[in-house]
């Protein structure tokens, strides 16, 4: 049975769409050379070129971290922490992206309105990844409970072995007398 489109929950992969919005914004901004005036384009050509490459590199790294984190379905706590580290790296790279936009805006003296969409979308992406990371806490709780149950089973199996060994030892000493 299908759910009517209006009643569907928003996809948990919202950050994927957000990322491509951020990426398109970055490419658009770079293709317009950060909306700098002609004199500033000449004066700050080195900065524009350098920050353009850096912003594209950061966007590629964000995508890579999101994809790697999404490919890990944790079956153990170590996998949960690996997934979380990838999410944390993606968030850190989003902040690096924001920092690069701020550097360009301050040095080239751009009006705030020029990069506001880029900054809002990057901030929205950060919040989406944080929400994704928060929703993953159920994995941690389940994996801790599983580890606790496994430890109890292991302890009870070990106790049974010790008990069996001691009872066999007791039989051996009574047989010798």
Give the ranges of each region predicted by the language model:
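Amphipathic alpha-helical assembly/interaction segments
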Residues: 1-177
């Amino acid at each position: 049975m299908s759910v009517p489109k209006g009643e569907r929950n928003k996809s948990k992969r919202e950050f994927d769409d957000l990322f491509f919005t951020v990426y398109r914004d970055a490419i658009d901004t770079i293709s317009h050379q950060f909306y700098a005036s002609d004199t500033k384009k000449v004066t700050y050509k080195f900065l524009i070129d350098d920050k353009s490459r850096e912003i594209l590199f950061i966007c590629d790294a964000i995508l890579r971290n999101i994809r790697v984190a999404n490919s890990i379905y944790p079956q153990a706590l170590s996998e949960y922490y690996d997934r979380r580290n990838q999410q944390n790296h993606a968030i850190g790279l989003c902040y690096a992206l924001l920092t690069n936009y701020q550097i360009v805006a301050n040095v080239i003296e751009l009006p705030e309105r020029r990069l506001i969409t880029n900054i809002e979308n990057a901030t929205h992406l950060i919040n989406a990844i944080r929400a994704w990371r928060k929703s993953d806490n159920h994995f941690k709780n389940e994996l801790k409970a599983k580890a606790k149950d496994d430890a109890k089973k292991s302890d009870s199996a070990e106790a049974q072995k010790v008990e069996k060994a001691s009872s066999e030892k007791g039989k051996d000493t009574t047989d010798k007398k």
